[in-house]
């Protein structure tokens, strides 16, 4: 059953809009940041990772965003190009902005944290004039993420992209991607997240992210109640993630699916959500049953958290299928 109206006549499969930054992952693991001396540089940012994941899976992928006019910005653009991502709408910001940096601390496979440098970052300089209506018209799917809503003018640019997508029948996926350090308050966050989510076809986030969005709703909802709220707007599918306990997908037609949980040799917890999103969206775009899309998303997540990198570790289709074949014990099930 097809849940989403992907227009197969459109020439571009997938566009992501938003954050492009640098991850600096600790090489000396099992120690605090204060004692870590060396880091390895990777392209980062949830929309960037998801776009890279989609490109690795063979999708014609583009990106809309801004990078700083510095060595890190040029590194990001070159990396995207080398991964087959169209960068014609990645703009070099000339205002003196900088590239966002994320230093990761890996004390243990389950005790990881991030030290962020996000002052005056280029990705939040994205302007409405940077959003090309025809570019979005030509895409089957647009991905937005919550961090891009945190400040103007990026916030307005994302809402314009949403309007163009709805005007031209481009399916919109909202990766909630809540990063509290980017926002002024939880109240501000909830307001803009809700305004964006009302316009989206697929919403993917953790239980904690949905709780943040519902802070004005009076009482805590369970997963099914949360999903039903968004079905009253434009959502067709809502996915609520529960970390190591897996994910649950709800459809507007009333179905519920519990996702596969795969074992992993966990190195760090970062990147699981991004790789899950890429695998899941890929499945939806190929009109797979939702349980199969969830299975591929879960497998991709297990692969990435077993690796030092996020972007470099985004798997190909063959790698996901090989991983699933090796772990055939789990399955996604209709609830």
From Swiss-Prot:
Pathway: Polyol metabolism; myo-inositol degradation into acetyl-CoA; acetyl-CoA from myo-inositol: step 5/7. GO terms for biological process: inositol catabolic process. SUPFAM superfamilies: Ribokinase-like. It comes from the Bacteria. The keyword Amino-acid biosynthesis does not apply. It catalyses: 5-dehydro-2-deoxy-D-gluconate + ATP = 6-phospho-5-dehydro-2-deoxy-D-gluconate + ADP + H(+). The keyword Iron-sulfur does not apply. Pfam families: PfkB. GO terms for molecular function: 5-dehydro-2-deoxygluconokinase activity; ATP binding. Keywords: ATP-binding, Kinase, Nucleotide-binding, Transferase. It is an enzyme of class 2 (transferase). Its EC number is 2.7.1.92. Belongs to the carbohydrate kinase PfkB family. Catalyzes the phosphorylation of 5-dehydro-2-deoxy-D-gluconate (2-deoxy-5-keto-D-gluconate or DKG) to 6-phospho-5-dehydro-2-deoxy-D-gluconate (DKGP). This is 5-dehydro-2-deoxygluconokinase. It comes from Geobacillus kaustophilus (strain HTA426). The lineage of its organism: Bacteria, Bacillati, Bacillota, Bacilli, Bacillales.
């Amino acid at each position: 059953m097809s849940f989403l109206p992907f227009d197969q006549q459109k020439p571009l499969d997938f566009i992501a809009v938003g954050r492009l930054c640098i991850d600096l992952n600790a090489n000396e693991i099992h120690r605090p940041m204060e004692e870590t001396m060396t880091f390895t540089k990777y392209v980062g940012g949830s929309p960037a990772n998801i776009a890279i994941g989609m490109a690795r899976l063979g999708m014609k992928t583009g990106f809309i965003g801004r990078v700083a006019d510095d060595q890190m910005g040029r590194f990001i653009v070159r990396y995207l190009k080398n991964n087959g991502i169209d960068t014609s709408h990645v703009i070099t910001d000339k205002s003196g902005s900088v590239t966002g940096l994320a230093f990761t601390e890996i004390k243990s496979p389950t005790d990881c944290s991030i030290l962020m440098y996000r002052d005056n970052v280029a990705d939040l300089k994205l302007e409405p004039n940077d959003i090309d209506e025809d570019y979005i018209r030509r895409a089957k799917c647009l991905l937005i993420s919550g961090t891009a809503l945190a400040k103007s003018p990026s916030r307005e640019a994302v809402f314009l992209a949403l309007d163009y997508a709805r005007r031209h029948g481009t399916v919109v996926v909202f990766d909630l991607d809540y990063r509290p350090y980017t926002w002024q308050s939880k109240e501000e966050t909830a307001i803009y997240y809700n305004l964006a989510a009302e316009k989206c076809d697929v919403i993917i986030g953790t239980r904690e992210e949905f709780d943040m969005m519902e802070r004005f709703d009076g009482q805590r909802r369970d997963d099914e109640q949360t999903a039903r709220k968004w079905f009253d707007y434009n959502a067709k599918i809502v996915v609520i993630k529960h970390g190591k306990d897996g994910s649950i997908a709800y459809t507007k037609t009333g179905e519920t699916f519990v996702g596969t949980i795969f074992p992993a040799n966990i190195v760090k917890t970062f990147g699981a959500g991004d790789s899950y999103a890429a695998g899941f969206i890929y499945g939806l775009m190929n009109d797979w049953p939702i349980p199969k899309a969830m299975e591929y998303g879960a497998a991709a997540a297990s692969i990435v958290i077993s690796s030092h990198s996020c972007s470099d570790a985004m798997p190909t289709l063959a790698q996901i299928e090989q991983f699933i074949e090796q772990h055939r014990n789990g399955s996604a099930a209709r609830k």
